[in-house]
Amino acid sequence: MKAIKLTGHERPLTQVKYNKEGDLLFSCSKDSSASVWYSLNGERLGTLDGHTGTIWSIDVDCFTKYCVTGSADYSIKLWDVSNGQCVATWKSPVPVKRVEFSPCGNYFLAILDNVMKNPGSINIYEIERDSATHELTKVSEEPIHKIITHEGLDAATVAGWSTKGKYIIAGHKDGKISKYDVSNNYEYVDSIDLHEKSISDMQFSPDLTYFITSSRDTNSFLVDVSTLQVLKKYETDCPLNTAVITPLKEFIILGGGQEAKDVTTTSANEGKFEARFYHKIFEEEIGRVQGHFGPLNTVAISPQGTSYASGGEDGFIRLHHFEKSYFDFKYDVEKAAEAKEHMQEAN
């Protein structure tokens, strides 16, 4: 599986994200600029310039009309994807660690860090659009709601929306997961103890009914949205920064590696700077993809399940298009089940 190396960022990557159609890849880094790339060949379409500090997070709406960024410069910006212009800016009292659009694209959440006496919160912003063109008509100048860190929880590090935007799920610095009911004024529903260390990433399944987490405690979990029940556990031998669920195939991809401060004294093999593929059902590692010479900070997979991208501490994005062997891979038990199904159909 040959990688396309995308060079454009000067500092470590913080997040990569595909649009819904999978033809564009969005990336942000600690160099204060975001980039948009063609996912087919890795050509850069343009940059989003305007932040003055690290951009921690980026997301694009379901129409590929607008994308949102959250930065350490105490601001959130909304961008027109077609021309790269900033169309709205929101000021924040603290750095913004994560942003994500709701499934309908009319709202987005932003995680505010718990620093400088700020308790930490998940702020919800509304974007009003033309129903026919999906063009922006009005934005809420202030958050329409603030989910303040619930008692007994540390501040949120990651968050996302479930199916139809019914719930918001958040991962926290103390390794816990919490759940909020959007239709009931974002009321706190429940929380569970999951990781031993801070949750570094959380990404949802294609149907938004379950999600995967990663943590520096070297573990990754698959969790059901409705019950917060742990479905699967994936154990590794290195700190994890990112995790994603693959469409089409029953796989998950994990990424991480040794702490960035120790990278200069460590070889790529010892640092474990690989994307690791696990079977989603059987919880077994099935392969690794090397290439980065630093920890993997972020991994994203195209909604069509035909390619994935990884962003590293080394400042590079590696774009991989899956080959036939990836789609053909099956466990013996999977082959036997398919053969049995074909026999039943024949009879």
Curated annotation (Swiss-Prot):
Its main location: cytoplasm. The modification Phosphoserine is found at residue 302. PROSITE patterns: WD_REPEATS_1, WD_REPEATS_2, WD_REPEATS_REGION. WD repeats lie at residues 8-47, 50-89, 149-190, 194-233, 291-330. Signal peptide: none annotated. SUPFAM superfamilies: WD40 repeat-like (SSF50978). GO terms for cellular component: cytoplasmic stress granule; eukaryotic 43S preinitiation complex; eukaryotic 48S preinitiation complex; eukaryotic translation initiation factor 3 complex; eukaryotic translation initiation factor 3 complex, eIF3m; multi-eIF complex. Keywords: Cytoplasm, Initiation factor, Phosphoprotein, Protein biosynthesis, Repeat, WD repeat. GO terms for biological process: cytoplasmic translational initiation; formation of cytoplasmic translation initiation complex; translation reinitiation; translational initiation. HAMAP family: eIF3i. This is Eukaryotic translation initiation factor 3 subunit I.
